[in-house]
C-alpha cells in the first residue's frame, strides 16, 4: 500500500501537487483530513512537515513518526553485525548500498569507508532520504552524510 502525501507547509497547492506526482502518491489536501480519519487508522501517510518530513500510520498521532534521523542513529554506540562484517576493509574503499531504505546501514557504512552510493528505487523513500540528509546538522553526522551519493533508481539498472 502506497502512502498518501499530506503537507503541513504553507507551500502552494501546485508545488505539493507536483511533489505528489513526482513521488507517485495520492494527495490529501488540508481540510480533507477529517473525512479520512475514520477510514485511515492503518493507512500510511507521507507528511511533508515545515522542517522535516516523515512517514506515519494513521492521522490520529498514536504512532511515532518514521523518518531518516541520521543524528539519532549516529548516537547509537552499539556495534552492528554489518560493521563486524566490514572489518578489514581499506578505509579508502567505496561501498554501494543497493537497497538504501531509510539509510541506517549507509550511515554505518560511511564510518568505515570513503564513500557510499545509496540506491533507492522507491521515489517517496528516496525523498525521505534526501530530507534526512538535508536536516543533518551535527558536524560528525555531516562528515558521514557528505560521503553519500544518493541515486533514485532500481539497483538492477545501475
Model-derived segments and their meaning:
Residues 20-23, 109, 133:
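Hydrophobic alpha-helical packing residues
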Residues 1-94, 119-158:
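S-adenosyl-L-methionine
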Residues 94, 114-115, 147:
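Residues at the starts of beta-strands that form the adenosine-phosphate
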Residues 1-2, 114-116:
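Short, surface-exposed connector motifs at secondary-structure boundaries
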Residues 10, 101-104, 124:
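Gly/Ser/Thr-rich loops at beta-strand to alpha-helix junctions
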Residues 102-114:
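Conserved SAM-binding loop of SAM-dependent methyltransferases across substrates and taxa
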Residues 98:
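Conserved beta-strand/loop positions that form the S-adenosyl-L-methionine
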